[in-house]
Amino acid sequence: MNLIIREVEFGEKPPVTKPHPDLLKFLGEDGLRKIVDDHYEAIRDSEIRFMFPMDEDEFEEAKKRAADFFIQILGGHPHFTETRGAPRMVGRHAPFRITPSARRVWLELYIPILESLEDRVPQPLIEIFWNYLNIFSTWMINTKED
């Protein structure tokens, strides 16, 4: 599987292509929530933990919102919009100092999770989702490295 992190220049905003909705058909909402749950649990033990809520209830709520967003972006029920309004993810992430290296860690934590799907999800669907994460995450970078 080809899950390589794309390096970008600060301020670069490549065009984003939504992931293929068939991924949600293979995983279902529960399966997608499990991917996000696994990712957030990996974040707990990572160097970017400080960027996420420290309060357990708030951390769980952030996890739920992330899963809601991905379900919606994959053509599922618009949970995110119903509860939070329009996604506007760049604006929602603006209060946080997101550097290229923080993005890299965030993506690296997804790699083993996505690789673990190979036995039940067609590889092209996983790679399309990865490409979405890879490009979409560049839009969240708002701080240069120190």
Label every PLM stretch briefly.
Residues 1-146:
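Core of compact, soluble alpha-helical bundle domains
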